[in-house]
């Protein structure tokens, strides 16, 4: 009987222990389920974050691609602008060469004008010599006086025309000086523009430059190129005007030289007639 009681007590104790272990295992199972649910939630959150990061990465890559495209466009615009500046430099160089040629023609015209003035002085001296000669033949004297009056009128007219030519030459020289000053101003503007191009090029190489500022610099740069082109056109127009003025002046000088030649021929004719008259008077 005692053995049965002991056995029952042992079985009861074992039952209690089994129940305790079952409770413990159940609690552990609950805790494991809670941890599993928590882990699954963390996994879902992690997947969500990964998806968000992937989306953000796609957006960043798209923005980077767009920024690279805009940068390439800016670099192309910069290359085009540099090409325009190089073309402007070449045109300004050609304009300077035209100005130099115009100055050479102006110097030639000035030299010819001086020679024509000397010829006019010589004609005036000859006129005075002829005027001071005394003639015994009254009719011949009257004819010579009329011819001298005509020659004096032609000489005065030539002097007036030479004065007009000199005035036109002075105007052309002033126009050329102004054109040279504007050309020098254009060169200074080009130097400033090249410096600004260098700064713009350095700024465009950095992706940190905002699109708004880059567009503002591009618009300012285009405006400066437009202003420089307008100034270049104005300088070219002035150079063309100076060239036409020099050509017109050259024609005027040539015409005056022809008139001087004709006047000299008239003086020679008068001198020949005077010599013939003196010979005839001496023969009497």
Swiss-Prot record:
Quote the protein name from its UniProt record. Tropomyosin
- What job does this protein perform? Tropomyosin, in association with the troponin complex, plays a central role in the calcium dependent regulation of muscle contraction.
- InterPro entries named among the record's database cross-references: Tropomyosin
| Family designation | Belongs to the tropomyosin family.
**Pfam families attached to this UniProt entry:** Tropomyosin
Q: What is the UniProt domain comment for this protein? A: The molecule is in a coiled coil structure that is formed by 2 polypeptide chains. The sequence exhibits a prominent seven-residues periodicity.
Q: Which residues form a coiled coil?
A: 1-284
Compositional bias (Basic and acidic residues): 12-39
Q: Does the record carry Coiled coil as a key word?
A: yes
| Region annotation (Disordered) ranges | 1-39
What keywords appear on the UniProt entry?
Answer: Allergen, Coiled coil, Repeat
Q: Does the keyword Hydrolase apply?
A: no
Subunit structure comment from the entry: Homodimer.
